[in-house]
Amino acid sequence: MIRAFVDEDVDAIQWLWDNGLSEYNFSSMKTTGKHTVFAPEHQLYSVARTYKPSANDPTRYKAAAHEIMDTVLATDAYKGVTIDFNTTANQLVANEQGQVLTVLATDENGQTVRYEAKKAVIMATGGYSGNAKMMSAFAKNGANYLVGGSTAADGYGIYMMQQVGANIDPTAMSYIPTFPMGHETAPGMGVIASSYMWKAGGISVNQEGFRFANENDADVVARETALEEQTNAIQYDIFTDKIIEDTEALNASVFWNFYYAPGKPYNSAVVCADSLAVLAEKLGIPAANLEATVKSYNEHVESGEPDEFGREYTEDAIKNNSAYCAAINKIEGEHYYAIPLKALVVMTLGGVSTNTDGQVLDVDGAVIPGLYAAGECVGGIWGRFVSGGTGVMGPIVFGRLAARAAMETEPATGYTLKTPAAVITEDMFAKDADSAESLFDMSQPLADGEYEATVDGQEGPMTVKVTVAEGKIAAVVVAENHETQAVAAAALEK
């Protein structure tokens, strides 16, 4: 599968280039001037291989990919494409020849819709990073992970394919990479928002008040898996005013400036105290442990000796690992700060098995006629951890391969569906009692007036205005959004 990805991705980039990518401004390597760069949000890799174009209209688009999508979908070649919104796919159905060419769905009015394909059904339903029950079932500490992506990524598409005999590797379902930088925005939900204070001398402690990893480790996987093993998968980044100042001076304060600084949206998450004991009390962790942890850390800063986790405290550490260690400081000063962060998931790596044409395979390795899959609902390609950049190009490449094969291949006849394995079970999709019912009693009249709120949309902030008249919601207007218009326009208009 990786060989197929490598062989196809140049053509995929060329396809994007021919459809408008050539008109964009790219980040470039200062040393070479080439468009391929390193992506700093991922662990550094050996060869610059990432393209980072900027949207031509940043007021409407967060990423060039969405702008290109709007451009491509507006061309004559795609005029016949219909997108059905507010319609939920429920079941795949095979015909008497064993061909999976039927999808049963439910529309917004609760009516059953039957879709009949001529040659193929392509499943591009995503993974299960939005399903806490599934993550809990397959990952040891999955119940503690924050959902960092769309709640629509519930894994049900994978379950639908399982029900027509698709093979699912249970081990690969446990491949749920996390990021040790999740800010909890709502119960069980979060966004990537590291403090980066550890770059300039900050430390991270667990619920017991102890450090558990080398915060400056260039191997991000080591830090990710270490947090997964901590109580409640939570860490507290501990830092001081001097560390904040150095982080800003060294241009390492992107998250602090955007999220946590005074006046920023998550500033309320910053816990401040005049002593470590008071800080520990506010965090609900043992004060004696935190004080002992900081004392030990400061002693290593003074001596310059590496600590038990391998963190180094010399100028050579800065010179040799500047991307992760920009300054060395003690934890001391008039004020002490903490930011709680949890393990957060934005993608999963388990799913159904396919061949290089995207054809879904059964438990015996045979092709299920007519059924294709691409993107995050396919499992076992990348292994246990994220390979930087594949989250974007993977779906593009394998989507093109699947679509090409679907157009060129007649589904085989005479196939018999295999008995589904019970890797994924129906109870993983059971809805919990909606706690919102106790918060919003819609049977009671609402207060008349106009209300406005800004929330996190899929592609950026979304401002919504609501008008209440005679105790009822009279109008809802999306005043500002950054969504991909070719996909979201119809839903936004409603």
Segments predicted by a language model, with ranges:
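Active-site- and interface-proximal helix/loop "cap" or "latch" segments in soluble metabolic
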Residues: 442-494
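Conserved redox-cofactor binding core of oxidoreductases
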Residues: 4-111, 132-133, 181-182, 294, ...
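Glycine-rich loop(s) and the adjacent beta-strand/alpha-helix scaffold that form part
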Residues: 110-185, 389-392, 398-401, 405
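An anion/pyrophosphate-binding glycine-rich loop and adjacent beta-alpha core
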Residues: 158-160, 167-285
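A glycine-rich dinucleotide-binding beta-alpha-beta segment and adjacent secondary-structure elements
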Residues: 91, 289-381, 478-481
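Helix-rich C-terminal "cap"/substrate-channel and partner-interaction subdomain
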Residues: 232-335, 402-405, 409-439
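Catalytic phosphate/nucleotide-handling subdomain of diverse soluble enzymes
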Residues: 362, 366-410, 414
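Glycine-rich phosphate/pyrophosphate-binding beta-alpha loops
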Residues: 176-181, 220-223, 343-349, 377-392, ...
